[in-house]
Amino acid sequence: MSFKVVIPARYASSRLPGKPLLDIAGKPMVVRVIERSLASGAAEVVVATDHERIQEAVSSYGYDVMMTSADHASGTDRIAEVVQQRGWEDDTIVVNVQGDEPLIDPRLIGEVAGNLSAHAEASMATACHVLHDTPSILNPNIVKVVLDQQGHALYFSRAPIPYPRDAFAANQDIPPGMPIYRHIGIYAYRAGFLRAYAALTPSAIEYFESLEQLRVLWHGYKISVEITEKAPASGVDTEADLAYVRSVVISGESKLL
């Protein structure tokens, strides 16, 4: 199975301006993400950016980078531009790896690509991980997903879904027998679907939840979800996240790449 990786890397960030260029043990964050993506076995890794500084940084390391429009509403829209400009065939599998996840497990990238390859009925694939603690379920910054019996996403939400009414009413923890899944923000698509996605009308529900993948479900497409044993890596959204990731890379450089 062959697949490509596209890393959307916007310069603007409300909390950490220029986030893709922040230093992590001597390399820009986006370069760390590229290295993890290459370790997944991807046939091609492309950074899609909207800023010349990111373009210059990636090029200086000899990696593939493409300037894209600054007007895209989401990373998926940015990736769709790459697919169109590169002329990739409709059946090409493209994995969206977030540019702020320098600790992402390369095996997870391959797992999600493989999941989509194995499910011809799905237009997209993503991943989830079982949650074991009530605070995480109640945390709106942790997105939850509910699956059908074929492993397709029924819905994504920042709310606790499914809601264990009786257990929570009795101040109990998560009841056994009904796993609650944390969505992991990695996506695989077929290039042909990305061309169609760019023309899909945004849905009110995606704005309400601030979750772009809901547009796909709203329009009736299927998303196959890989249940992984690999806990999601720490992304970088705050100064505290950045400090943690730096400490992990510095202390375990040989393990990380």
UniProtKB/Swiss-Prot annotation:
Keywords, alphabetical: Cytoplasm, Lipopolysaccharide biosynthesis, Nucleotidyltransferase, Transferase
One of the record's GO molecular function terms: 3-deoxy-manno-octulosonate cytidylyltransferase activity
Matches recorded under InterPro entries: Cytidylyl_trans (IPR003329), KdsB (IPR004528), Nucleotide-diphossugar_trans (IPR029044)
Catalytic activity, EC: 2.7.7.38
Principal EC category: transferase
Pfam family, one: CTP_transf_3
Subcellular location: Cytoplasm
Keyword flag Transmembrane helix: no
Chain's role: Activates KDO (a required 8-carbon sugar) for incorporation into bacterial lipopolysaccharide in Gram-negative bacteria.
Name used for this protein in its record: 3-deoxy-manno-octulosonate cytidylyltransferase
Source species of the chain: Methylobacillus flagellatus (strain ATCC 51484 / DSM 6875 / VKM B-1610 / KT)
Gene giving rise to this polypeptide: kdsB
